[in-house]
Amino acid sequence: MSIFKELKRSDHPRVLGAIDIFKYIGPGLLVTVGFIDPGNWASNFAAGSDFGYSLLWVVTLSTIMLIILQHNVAHLGIVTGLCLSEAAVKYSPKWLGRPIIVSGFLASISTSLAEILGGAIALQMLFGISIPNGALLTTAAVLIMLFTNSYKRMEKAIIGFVSMIGLAFLYELILVDIPWETALKGAFIPSVPQGSLMIVMSVLGAVVMPHNLFLHSEIVQSREIYLKGEERIKKMLKYEFVDTLFSMIIGWAINSAMILLAASTFFAHGEHVSELAQAQAMLTPLLGNNAANIFAIALLLAGISSTITSGMAAGSIFAGLFNEAYNVKDAHSIIGIVLSLGIALLVIFFLGDPFKGLIVSKMVLSIQLPFTVFLQVSLTSSKRVMGRYVNRKSTTILLYFLAALVSGLNIWLLIELIK
C-alpha cells in the first residue's frame, strides 16, 4: 500500500475553494527543489558573473519548459493512479519499459551524487569539514529524515527549506544595488552575448531532470479531495496546475535571484566565478561575513532538500520496477533509497577527485534524460493509458518538440563534456 494512503479524508474539508487550492500546494514545491539544486547554483553564478543580467531570460524560458513537462507528467499520476515507473511497467513492452526504468534509477544515483556534494561543499564553507566527511554527514542526515518521518512531515520540511532559501536570497539582494530596468530586459528579451552559448545550453539542458519526472507523478497522488470519478480528476488536474505553476514561479524567482546577486557583485567588479566555494569566499569582502554565511547556509539547505527528493525519487523508481507505489516502510522503496544514496556516497569517497564525479553525473543524466522524456510523452499521448484525458494533438506536438529540444541540448552537452 502506498505511503500516501496515510492521508485521511478527514484531513480535507468537503467544501472546495481557494483554501483547498492553498492546501493542495506542496508536490510542486518538492519538484522545485531539483530546479534550485547545487548544480543550478553553479550555472547561475557563472552566468551572472560572466554576462551580468543578459542571461536572465534563459531562466524564464527554462521555467516555461519545466512547467509544461512537469504538468504533463503530473497528469499521468492523477489520471492513472500510477507513477511514471509503474506506468512504464504496466503499459510498455518489457524490452523497452524496464531498461528505461533501470537507466532512470542510474540517473537518480547520478543526481544524488551531485546533491550530496552540494551539501558537503556547504559544510566545508561553514565548518571546514572535508568533502568526504561532509558528504557522509549530509547522507546520514537525509537517511534519518527519510526513515523517521512521514511523507507529510517531509513535505512540510521541504517547504520550510525552500522558504528559507528564498528568504536568504532576498536578504542578499537587499544588500546590493540592482538596475531593475536592465534586469527586467534581461529576464524577458533574449540575447546571446559572445561566448555565452555554453552556459545558455547548460542552463536550458539541465533544467529538466529525470528523477523529477518520476517523483512528480508519484507525489501528486498524495492529494485527495471529497469528489469521485470524473469530477474528482477534473478538480485535481486544475489544482495540480495551480500547484505546479506557483511552485515553478518560486523556482524561477530563486534562480533569477542567484543571477541578480552574481551580476550585481561579481560582474560589476569584473570577477569571474567558476566554483561555489569561490563565490562564497568572494562575497565576504564585497558584502560582509553575514552575506557569505547566509549564502553557505542556503546552499546547505538546497543540498539537503535536493538529496531528500532524489532519494524519494530513487525509492519510487525502484519500487515501480516491482509494480509497487512508493512507501518508505516498504522493502523495495527502502532498497531504492539506500542504493541510490549509498552508491553516490561511495563514489565521492573513492574517487580521487570528487568533482570528476560531477562530470560523470552530468554525462549519465545527458544520456538518460531523452529516454525518460520520450517515455513520458508516449504514455500521456496514449488513449489506452490516459483515456479521455489523453494529450490533444497540439499538446502532443508541443511535448515532442520540447522532448526533442531538451534531448538535443543534452546530447550537445554530452559531446562538449567528452571533448
Language-model features: where?
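Membrane-interface "cap" regions at the ends of multi-pass membrane proteins
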Residues: 1-39, 94-95, 199, 235-239
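Flexible loop linkers connecting adjacent transmembrane helices
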Residues: 3-10, 43-48, 71-96, 121, ...
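Juxtamembrane transmembrane-helix boundary signature
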Residues: 31, 58-90, 99-110
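Extracellular/periplasmic helix-exit of transmembrane alpha-helices
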Residues: 65-79, 220-224, 229, 249-278
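Hydrophobic transmembrane alpha-helices that form the core helical bundles
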Residues: 75, 97-128, 135-139, 303-322, ...
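Loop-to-transmembrane helix boundary motifs in multi-pass membrane proteins
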Residues: 94-95, 132-135, 246, 292, ...
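Transmembrane alpha-helical segments of multi-pass small-molecule transport proteins
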Residues: 101, 126-148, 164-169, 327-346, ...
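Hydrophobic alpha-helical segments and their helix-loop junctions in multi-pass secondary transporters
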Residues: 162-189, 204-220, 375-384, 409-418
